[in-house]
Amino acid sequence: MRKDIHPEYQEVLFHDTNADVFFLTRSTAKTKATREYEGKEYPYYPLDISSASHPFYTGEQRKTSNEGRVASFNKRFGAFGGRSKAKKTDAE
């Protein structure tokens, strides 16, 4: 087997920002952010949604505070309209 081809498998602190719940588990997720949890420093990975806030697992519907990328883009640039058709002149 070749050496040094596998990603580092380490303990990572995941944070569901909507439910404000922390999960400590092992993962290969890469992140530069760190956070202290129960007296130890762990790599920190924020999540928009997890089993703690997903309607399928919680059994309740609630709106998440974060918008998706497409909705955010449309909110910022939706007023521009998009493609416009070229106007025909009477000279044709």
UniProtKB/Swiss-Prot annotation:
Single GO BP term: translation
Domain of life of the source: Bacteria
Disulfide-bond pairs as recorded: none
One Pfam family hit: Ribosomal_L31
Keywords: Ribonucleoprotein, Ribosomal protein
A molecular-function term among this protein's GO annotations: structural constituent of ribosome
Signal sequence range: none
A cellular component term, taken from the record's GO annotations: ribosome
Quaternary structure and interacting proteins, as annotated: Part of the 50S ribosomal subunit.
Family statement drawn from the similarity comment of this UniProt entry: Belongs to the bacterial ribosomal protein bL31 family. Type B subfamily.
HAMAP family linked to this entry: Ribosomal_bL31_2
Stated name of the protein: Large ribosomal subunit protein bL31B
